[in-house]
Amino acid sequence: MKYYIPTKVYQEIDAVKVHAEELAGYGSYALIVTGKYSARANGALADVEAALDAYGKKHVQYDGIEENPSVETVMKATEFGKRNGVDFVIAIGGGSPMDAAKAIAIMLANPEKDAEYLYESAAHTKALPVVTIPTTCGTGSEVTGVAVLTVHAKRTKA
């Protein structure tokens, strides 16, 4: 078995501002995925929006990610992203927004698939670009290709 997960990690003060050009280079319209409050309260959302605005990139926020994100939430966010025509995804927050963003990126790149694709398929090879802006430490979601989601229909996580 072989894995290739191209990941860049920047750990520095004002990393979003310092790397704004790279952040803006992933597409023309970003879906910013967050929880309800913290990304706005801690200033991370404002930093990301300013970086995208500086390079003329459009962006829209989906702030409905709950703790232990569900497949249902991912599908709602996917529909929101489709309606807006986004072409890359940015997650701001802890493991929940980051995991949700990865799943949303998979579903946006595979519009013909339904929710079961997220937990019935062994591997996903197609996704929109994802940028993660972690605001907590400990989950490691920013450096993996894995997303943990709650599957209410099966009363489990996948």
Where are these regions (language model features)?
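Short secondary-structure transition/capping segments
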Residues: 80-85, 105-117
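Gly/Ser/Thr-rich helix-start
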Residues: 13, 36, 94-96, 139-141, ...
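ATP/NTP phosphate-donor binding region
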Residues: 1-88
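Short Gly/Thr/Asp-enriched flexible loops that form oxyanion-binding sites at enzyme active sites
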Residues: 47-48, 76-78, 97-110, 143-144
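A glycine/threonine-rich phosphate-anchoring loop and its flanking beta-alpha core
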Residues: 7, 109-158
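Glycine/serine-rich anion-binding loops at beta->alpha junctions
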Residues: 86-104, 135-141
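Low-complexity, flexible helical/coil segments
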Residues: 66-72, 93-99, 124-130
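Hydrophobic/aromatic beta-strand patches that form the interior of the parallel beta-sheet core
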Residues: 60, 90, 129-133
